[in-house]
């Protein structure tokens, strides 16, 4: 039994992750998708060929149940092709990084797996090389910066931002803060290749007017610091690029409270038994170029969105179903409606 097709390292979970396995004689092929972080089952072994296909492994039992992420069976075949992405997407969990400027763990944002192949009821015959897959909808080649926002950005005083780097080796990020004619630089290093989260906290650079974040071959992001507005709301969201993006909406246009009461009617008239309250806030962006508005439009389909206040990220829901990203002959801003993840329920009787 032989693996004839294996996805590339750090392929995106938003697309297909197709494997293929073949055997000489027709028969059943059992496929098991195993969490590599849980460790291979004892007795399983395999050697990857130079082109990424995998030779037969030594006899052994399949991985334990705690490591099993999914399974498939193909009946009476010599070849089997399958997509494992649907089994893995639910394993990715995004939590925005918190803390000071520097690299932070990307825990939960990638999934590393082996795929095992065996005849039904038999020992494992082939094991694919371990592959790490990342969130996102499009392929990217390291080294690169995973983002849907432009590389020149505005950021309010005291705010934070997050950069997602895909590296092919050690990476050094240098942050240069400019204040008038004075410049100060700090360097941060990640020793290993892979997916890295770099957080920029402007509280570490209180007097900066501009900041340049130079990640070497991954790319450079330039920030212009603007005054913070008291009524501004900073949103963070999981983007199609597989990153967490941030943007401060300077205008809070409306805030509406809606309540639905459940009532009973008795001798004394109507009596409120319970009430459900929902609060919806409409935010308006600054007048932005097309690239920023396209990135903000992802909010309408983002699987996870938060309101960012310092190191506190509060999950919210997006109530808007559409976003206008261009109007002929005029600059455009974008309106987005947000609401709490849960309604407030009150019982009176």
For each predicted feature, which ranges?
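Preference for solvent-exposed, low-hydrophobicity sequence contexts
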Residues: 1-228
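Extracellular/virion structural assembly segments
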Residues: 2-20, 24, 56, 153-168, ...
